[in-house]
């Protein structure tokens, strides 16, 4: 992607994706970890968590839509990211690792196809839009879950402290990976941010294995 865009445009797209990721994390309301942990315990929390995430994502998307002067790409990214994250969290909680792997691989393939395709049609805005669409295509899985289990907000009452802690933890993680880019871009420009982001990508590779281990251990430990 960087070789196709050049460092300045790559920095610009990294800046807007960082905004979208941070906003998406806020919109998730800590539901990702909550779904993983309580689904692994057999609690039927999915539909309630999905509805909460959808309402929050729509609200956040509308706010960002007007902030960025009717840029629908970021809004679609937020809604898609939230719903896709909740779907994969459910798979992890149920220990459906094969489904989790397949859906992630398919999404990554779709991401490349749509991001590159929409870039050639629309420019930089098309990349974020393409990524968002690659997430949203799996929304039907959430619709199906609404038919299989009822929405019950009483489930949250005794678990609000855990949900709050999960939200703060997720927000801290997202901030550590996004705030630096939000500072660098306005102060030093997109070109420098592009070079900075390229360097960060190599460091991110080192965190892939620990991240996979964490996602496997969390539902296992929650059951124990």
Regions found by a protein language model. Name each.
Residues 4-7, 93-94, 121, 187-190:
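Helix-loop interface residues and adjacent transmembrane-helix termini in multi-pass membrane transporters
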Residues 12, 44-55:
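Membrane-interface alpha-helices at helix entry/exit sites of multi-pass transporters
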Residues 2-22:
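Extracellular/periplasmic helix-loop-helix junction of adjacent transmembrane segments
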Residues 24-28, 32, 60-64, 115, ...:
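Alpha-helical transmembrane segments and their lipid-water interface positions
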Residues 25-43, 203-224:
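Helix-loop junctions and terminal segments of transmembrane helices
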Residues 52-169:
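Hydrophobic transmembrane helix module of multi-pass membrane transport proteins
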Residues 8-11, 47, 98, 124-125, ...:
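Residues that define the loop-to-transmembrane-helix transition and helix capping
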């Amino acid at each position: 992607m960087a070789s196709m865009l050049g460092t300045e445009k790559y920095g610009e797209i990294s800046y807007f994706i960082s905004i979208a990721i941070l906003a998406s994390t806020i919109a998730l309301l800590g539901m990702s970890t909550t779904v993983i942990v309580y689904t692994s315990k057999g609690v039927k929390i999915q539909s309630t968590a999905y509805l909460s995430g959808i309402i929050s994502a729509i609200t956040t998307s509308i706010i960002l839509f007007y902030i960025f002067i009717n840029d629908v790409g970021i809004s679609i990214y937020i809604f898609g990211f939230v719903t896709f994250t909740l779907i994969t969290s459910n798979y992890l909680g149920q220990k459906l690792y094969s489904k989790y792997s397949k859906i992630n691989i398919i999404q990554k393939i779709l991401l490349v196809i749509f991001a590159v395709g929409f870039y050639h049609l629309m420019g930089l805005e098309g990349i974020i839009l393409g990524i968002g669409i690659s997430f949203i295509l799996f929304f039907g899985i959430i619709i199906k879950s609404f038919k299989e289990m009822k929405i019950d907000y009483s489930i949250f009452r005794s678990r609000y402290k855990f949900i709050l802690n999960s939200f703060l933890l997720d927000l801290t993680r997202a901030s550590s990976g996004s705030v630096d880019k939000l500072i660098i871009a306005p102060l030093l420009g997109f070109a420098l941010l592009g070079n900075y982001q390229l360097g960060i990508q190599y460091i991110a590779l080192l965190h892939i294995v620990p991240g996979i281990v964490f996602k496997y251990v969390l539902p296992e430990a929650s059951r124990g």
